[in-house]
Amino acid sequence: MMEPALADGLTEGARGLGLELTDSQTGLLLRYADLIARWGRVYNLTALREPNELLTHHLLDSLAAVPPLRRQTGGAAVRVLDAGSGAGLPGLVFAIVCPELDVTCVDTVGKKAAFIQQAAAELDLRNVQARHARVERLAGPPFDVIASRAFASLADFTALTRHALAPGGVWMALKARDVEREAAALDADIEMFHVEP
C-alpha cells in the first residue's frame, strides 16, 4: 500500500508539470505504482522498488510527456502505441490521465504484457490493450502517436515502428540523454520538431 505522503508528492509533482490531476486519477496512479511494487520482483518489471523512486522515476517521468501529448492530440480520441512498454510506462499513465486515448502497450516479454493486461483490468482501464509481440511485427490499424521510454535509440525506434505510424502521425520518444547525437542519426525524411527540456 502506498504511503499518504506519496499522494501529496504526486499531486505536487504533477502540478509542477502543469497538470491538475483529479482525485480519481491520483488514486489510480498510486494503485498502479503499488501494483508495480508488488509484482515487480515476480515479473522483473523494473529495477526500482521503493515507492519514492517509483513516483519520481516512473510516474512523474511519464506524466512529463502528457502536456506535449495533449498539445499534439488536441484532446482527440486517437490511437497511441507504447513500444517496448515494460511495466506499462508511459502507456498506462497516458491511459489514466487521458482517458480519451486508445492505448496499446506492446512488449516482447510475455510476463510483462500479462502484467499490463492485469493492471489495466484491476484499474478498470478499458482504453488499454496489452500485446505480447515484437513491435516490428505488429499488424493492425496504424497509430496516430507512437511513444517509447527507455526502448531504443531514436533511429532504431523509428525504423522498428515506421510501418505502424499513421499518415500524419508522430513519434514521441522520452529520452534523457544523447538526444542530439541520436537525432543526427535519424533518416533524412524524419523531422524532429520538438524537444521538451
Description of each model-found segment:
Residues 1-75, 81, 111-112, 118-128:
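Class I SAM-dependent transferase core
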Residues 13, 26, 97, 185-189:
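Alpha-helical structural signal in soluble globular domains
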Residues 36, 94, 174-175:
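Residue-level signal for inorganic ion chemistry
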Residues 72-76, 138-141:
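Glycine-rich phosphate-binding loop signature in dinucleotide/nucleotide-binding domains
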Residues 82-86:
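Conserved S-adenosyl-L-methionine
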Residues 87-100:
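Conserved SAM-binding loop of SAM-dependent methyltransferases across substrates and taxa
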Residues 100-197:
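S-adenosylmethionine
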